[in-house]
Amino acid sequence: MTDVLIRPARLEDADALAELGLRTFLDTFVAPDGFAIPYPEADLQPYLDQSFGAEAVRRRIAEAASGYWLAERDGVLLAYANAGPNGLPHPDARPGDQELRRLYVDKCAQGLGLGTKLLAIALDWMTGHSTGPLWIGVWSGNLKAQKLYAAHGFEKAGEYEYPVGAWRDHEFILRRG
């Protein structure tokens, strides 16, 4: 087994990233051994298609104003991070601020430190591309993620309702800077 390689995502990674994102979302938020959020199927499936379809991932990778990184071992994707212009609904948010959009680690790779490594890369990139604070939206029940972000200087700055179809997840808005 080779070491884990962390690198920028490429367009040809889109299909594998879409599969990893979908699997990680379902394992984390929907599965009985995850948070088991009872999303109605009518809300969940369109959200999954919109968020984790290969074409949507290709568009995000191609965005000039965003950064996208992945961790892989032996050609198998284990984790990824995506950052770009802030889109969180906070009154202090300004054009030029940056947001960590996603930080996903496959269930089989948790505990390897990949989330922390990808977060550090994303934060360096965000700092270099931001004219103001850095932002993260995190589900209110995901205490593990909140603890990781707090260890990197993020503090709760607000709350909002994140739409998954008509369903709403209660999210915290975190800010650093």
PLM features: what roles do these ranges have?
Residues T2-L5:
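Extreme N-terminal starter segment of soluble prokaryotic enzymes
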Residues P8-A14, A18-C108, L119-W125, H129, ...:
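Acetyl-CoA-dependent GNAT
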Residues E19, L77, G111-G113, W135, ...:
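Short glycine/serine/threonine-biased micro-segments
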Residues R94-Q98, G132-G177:
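C-terminal "cap" of GNAT-fold acetyltransferases
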Residues R102-A120, H129, S140-K147, A151-H152:
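Conserved glycine-rich acetyl-CoA-binding loop
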